[in-house]
Amino acid sequence: MAGKRVAVIGAGASGLACIKCCLEEGLEPVCFERTDDIGGLWRFQESPDEGRASIYKSVIINTSKEMMCFSDYPIPDHFPNFMHNSQVLEYFRMYAKEFGLLKYIQFKTTVCSVKKRPDFSTSGQWEVLTECEGKKESAVFDGVLVCTGHHTSAHLPLESFPGIEKFKGQYLHSRDYKNPEKFTGKRVIVIGIGNSGGDLAVEISHTAKQVFLSTRRGAWIMNRVGDHGYPIDILLSSRFSQFLKKITGETIANSFLERKMNQRFDHAMFGLKPKHRALSQHPTVNDDLPNRIISGSVKIKGNVKEFTETAAIFEDGSREDDIDAVIFATGYSFSFPFLEDSVKVVKNKVSLYKKVFPPNLEKPTLAIIGLIQPLGAIMPISELQARWATLVFKGLKTLPSQSEMMTEISQVQEKMAKRYVESQRHTIQGDYIETMEEIADLVGVRPNLLSLAFTDPRLALQLLLGPCTPVHYRLQGRGKWDGARKTILTVEDRIRKPLMTRVTESSNSVTSMMTMGKFMLAIAFLAIAVVYF
């Protein structure tokens, strides 16, 4: 399929990665972006277009820079470990400029429909209808990469909150929240304790008279900052920790995580402890919530049973009067209306092989990129998905039979149903390392730790015990990057660089302790490599 045209729908993080992957494989990408700029979710707008992903002005990303970068383009070392949304967008602009991606994007262009050509069973081609400034055009493409994300359509379940129609105060979805000023001096209820709900409750509590955070189940709250000040995802995302989880089981892993989170504050005492285990729900990442709760600025409440004109009555019988505003941080739903019947979404559930390919197509020339909710960054997963999809489009990689794909999809869905609480939020979950390793295997770029243990033991040890960063998948195989080894071995330097803005007496106690721990674990490396890899 070399030299063939591929339509890329959306110019957010996934779309940019797809354009670059197409170029690397000799394909001709044409990216359609409905707005006038790149960035998708991460481009803040005070008044976003309908159907476009939207964030609030203060958003800080929940994954650290080393874990979220594109695999052959590290984020500058002076950038903070957890970046403001404007810095995330700046990084995307740098990436697009570095690899010359902008010239392949048609801005202000909406994709109206993507239909199979009459000869699709033999050609695998698609007819893509677009509209730009009132003018419609149709073009034929040999492949389609859908990168529209899953934070576009606000999920607002008003039917679950009787009386909301007579509530005299203001109510809105978190998508429409931008800053806290308009809630100054007011009594506000935030419904939902995901990442957005927690962030909004904290931010509004600095100006509001009182904030109530309503939750049906409670939540486990994870801090961005882990032991010794390292980013929490850096500490938790190693192949060794994944290995320990596999051999000890989820029960032990749950107990470990819950103990760590309860060491920071007692979730039961703060009214947050859920009935489910830590790994049965996407944890809420929030650094400030316990501080706002202990100061009384945020009060945790149960689920709202009903609203009156001015009050909220909760399921435990308690009541809060004189409520001025209600913010529904109740998540999002996703759909692909332009695909018609090619990809069906029912209750936020979709059947995709490896969360990428529809299993029912005669030709594998359509892929959904970035439709996953990992405990970790989406960007590197999207990039690996794009690398795999372009190889499939070219015929260099093949998919199993339809029946085999459907069997695996069913098995994955059953596994997810057993692990996670039933929620619209938990239909596209995926473990970060497991997903990355699985797709890397399919692409042929998963590092061979056993081989490296003999040829480059220092690197092998870092790959096993250090954070599983996206750069690991540029060490070998197709798309190998010469700077990968050095970037992997200097990850700690880039973590420390933005923090060390004041000269102090050097203290190597933490580093020495971490190094000693690595050497202690190194003696078990060969045995683990033989068993696990």
From Swiss-Prot:
FAD binds at residues 10-14, 33, 41-42, 62-63. Keywords: Endoplasmic reticulum, FAD, Flavoprotein, Lipid metabolism, Membrane, Methylation, Microsome, Monooxygenase, NADP, Oxidoreductase, Phosphoprotein, Transmembrane, Transmembrane helix. The keyword Transmembrane applies. It catalyses: N,N-dimethylaniline + NADPH + O2 + H(+) = N,N-dimethylaniline N-oxide + NADP(+) + H2O; NADPH + O2 + H(+) = H2O2 + NADP(+); heptan-2-one + NADPH + O2 + H(+) = pentyl acetate + NADP(+) + H2O; octan-3-one + NADPH + O2 + H(+) = pentyl propanoate + NADP(+) + H2O. NADP(+) binds at residues 196-199. InterPro entries: FAD/NAD-bd_sf, Flavin_mOase, Flavin_mOase-like, Flavin_mOase_5, FMO-like. One of its GO terms (cellular component) is endoplasmic reticulum membrane. It is an enzyme of class 1 (oxidoreductase). Kidney and liver. Pfam families: FMO-like. One of its GO terms (biological process) is xenobiotic metabolic process. Belongs to the FMO family. This is Flavin-containing monooxygenase 5.
